Amino acid sequence: MSNVLVVAGHEFSRLARSPLVIFVVVIICLSTVINAAGCSVLLHKIDDVAAEPFMSGIGNLFYFSSIFFSFLALCMGIMVVSGDRSVGALRVLVTKPLHGRDIIAGKLLGMNALLLALVTLFVALGAASLAVSYGMPHDSGETALKLIIFGAGLFLFCALVTVLTTFLGVVFRELVSVLAISVSFLVIAWFARLQYVYAAVGKFELVNPVVQYVRLSAPVAGCDIFNPYADQFIFSAWFAAALPFAMLVVAEIGMLFAASCLLFKDEEK
């Protein structure tokens, strides 16, 4: 376990100092400020008809933040295995007294710890800037719960993307191949959310990780955490409807992580 934490700490600090993450923090700050400025006018227009306009303002950031963070997670996942392999850094780690599973687990732990910090920063800044520009939510407790659900769902989706790209980095040795497959998969996953694609594939759309992620926020009609016109948010109803999707995402993360560790262990031999 100590070896995993050492690798995780190194990966966290290495990625945190990268220009990519600095760029991300700048984009996070700009997007929350721009959204708050727009919502300061927009949300007051629906005050009379909306039960809780505050979450509608957060919902404006949903697709932007989801696509943005998923591509950030993809870049990180490619960097930590395929990128390191392309410059020979993995060969240095393998010569150390480390098991293959320690390297993969440590890299994923450090990477996802940084993503968790960035997601938390994004949600906190988004809520704080909205509270300053528009005002406090009508029900602070319910809004806080919805913000936690949004942040947790976004982090789970990012974790799934990182473990998927790590798995691809272990399977395919060429950086270009991993980059092409990962980007293509993510673009297709988001593109498949279009209505005419759903009409063609029907229930098979549920295998799409983007669909699984979106269903965490709105698992069934009436349980959308961003719906400003809902009179009451019933947590038990949301939990019962969203739990299968959350378990599916966690199971996918676990299976891809286990497969990555096993395959990388074979490479070590």
Please tell me what each predicted stretch does.
Residues G38-S56, L179, S184-L263:
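Terminal transmembrane helical anchor/hairpin motif
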Residues I28-G77, A105-R173, F235-A240:
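Secretory targeting signals
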Residues M1-I28:
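Aromatic- and glycine-rich beta-strand/loop motifs that create alpha-glucan
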Residues R14, S82, L93-T95, T165, ...:
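Helix-capping/transition residues at the boundaries of transmembrane alpha-helices
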Residues A73-G77, L90, L125, L164, ...:
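Hydrophobic/aromatic residues in alpha-helical transmembrane segments
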Residues V25-I28, K107-L108, S182-V183, V249:
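Residue-level recognition of transmembrane alpha-helices
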Residues L74-V94, G100, L108:
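Transmembrane helix boundary and interhelical loop/hinge segments in multi-pass membrane proteins
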Residues K265-K269:
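Short cytosolic juxtamembrane segments of multi-pass membrane proteins
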